[in-house]
Design a protein with these regions (language model features):
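Repeated scaffold domains used in trafficking and secretory/extracellular systems
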Residues: 50-60, 105-116, 152-162, 197-208, ...
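Bacterial signal peptide processing site
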Residues: 23-25
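Beta-strand-rich domains and repeat architectures in extracellular enzymes and scaffolds
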Residues: 46-84
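Beta-strand C-termini and the immediately following turn/loop, strongest in propeller blades
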Residues: 65-73, 78-80, 121-129, 167-173, ...
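Bacterial N-terminal signal peptides that target proteins for export
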Residues: 1-11
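Surface-exposed loop/turn elements that mediate protein-protein interactions on large endomembrane-trafficking
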Residues: 32-46, 76-101, 128-150, 176-194, ...
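C-terminal motif of bacterial Sec signal peptides marking the signal peptidase cleavage site
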Residues: 18-21
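Blade-level signature of beta-propeller repeat domains, shared across WD40, Kelch, NHL, RCC1
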Residues: 334-364
């Protein structure tokens, strides 16, 4: 049979299939339980000739980035990063708004954008050591200067307002808590002291509006302390058997993924607290952990233990559902990703190995 005859015989079938597809999915929209394919938009990164880019924060069209190089220790036993450049980049205009060569050498590993062309960054001072213990928070603007230095660990640094950032920390003297950082300096937003009943954890920190939430251990239990703008503290103690995987602070209260043992049965719970009530979803104990929880306006993201990106959505019953994301390129499945909340209901997903950046707007 000739090729033209075959094509002619297939045309009616192809026409029917095309009409069915258009009828089932107008405008390319997917079912309400799925994520529209157009919510992920790849963004440009600043061009570099040496090293690689690491995105630390995102606010609107601005990203805070560093250019870093991976180096080996003198004995070749371990690798470390050295920051060569700090910059603020507008992904829409595709141009740099500010670029600095760090006056203080080190590994700038966390950061927060401020209003204008300024930022606050977390710095490992003894970055060539296998286990750094000298840290600083640095201001970058019209000048570069140290806001605070400590021996211990600067753990998480997050934007708090257009003029401030928050950083969780612990010192070798036993003090721990949260610093409030601005161009004017450093103050204590939450100050605790380690003793027989109180101890720091991993420095997990979350921000929502003018409130923040910090995790530590008290009397052997994981405790989440939410601090309001007026300094009021609201402590939430998890069950004695609970182990914290991750959490985030929402307008209604904390969203928590935790491992618990109840009635000799191990399980994981994704719990949303709202108006004093707990809305729980049970997850598999073995592989149900969620990390890097980020949530805003009823949607968010997290990663599982295999770096699989998970979409979070608020359900009508008040619980938060979770499913794997399949809309991104296959090579980005189960690889390291940094989830950034942009503060406007959108999120940025930075893949350091692939050097790719996406904006995600789940409600679009």
């Amino acid at each position: 049979m000739k090729r033209s005859t075959i094509l002619c015989s297939l045309l009616p079938v192809l026409l029917v299939l095309s009409l069915c597809a258009c009828s089932a999915s107008p405008s390319g929209a997917s079912d309400g339980a799925e994520t529209p394919n157009n919510i992920f938009h790849e963004l440009p990164l600043p061009a570099v000739t040496e090293g690689q880019v690491s995105v630390l924060d995102a606010r609107g069209s601005r990203i805070l980035y560093v250019r870093e190089e991976k180096l080996l220790s003198k004995d070749g036993g371990y690798a470390y990063y050295e920051t060569k450049q700090v910059g603020i980049y507008d992904v829409n205009a595709q141009k740099s708004l500010a670029v600095w060569e760090p006056e203080t050498p080190g590994n700038y590993f966390g950061g927060a954008l401020l209003d204008g062309d300024a930022a606050i960054l977390a710095l490992q001072l003894d970055y060539t050591n296998a286990y750094p213990a000298q840290f600083a928070a640095m201001y970058f603007g019209g000048s570069q200067r140290s806001l605070v230095e400590l021996t211990g660990e600067l753990q998480w640094l997050l934007p708090f307002s257009g003029k401030e950032a928050l950083a969780s920390y612990r010192t070798e003297e036993g003090a721990f808590g949260v610093y409030r950082l601005s161009a004017d300096g450093c103050t204590d937003a939450l100050l605790l002291q380690a003793d027989a009943n109180t101890e720091p954890m991993g420095g997990d920190l979350a921000v929502c509006g003018d409130r923040f939430c910090y995790a530590y251990a008290k009397n052997g239990q994981v405790t989440l302390c939410t601090v309001s703008a007026d300094g009021t503290q609201d402590a939430l103690a998890l069950p004695e058997s609970a182990k914290l995987d991750s959490f985030w602070l929402t307008a209604d209260g904390p969203l928590i993924c935790q491992y618990v043992e109840q009635d000799s049965k191990a399980q994981r719970l994704l719990t949303r607290y709202a108006s004093g009530e707990a809305h729980e979803v049970t997850r598999p104990a073995a592989d149900g952990a969620l990390y890097q929880l980020r949530f805003a306006n009823g949607c968010g993201f997290a990663v599982n233990g295999s770096w699989g990106l998970q979409l979070l959505q608020l359900s009508e019953d008040g619980t938060v559902s979770c499913r794997g994301v399949t809309e991104l390129p296959g090579e980005l499945t189960s690889v390291q990703v940094r989830i950034l909340s942009s503060g406007d209901g959108s999120f940025c997903l930075f893949y350091p190995e692939a050097q790719r950046l996406f904006r995600a707007v789940p409600n679009s």
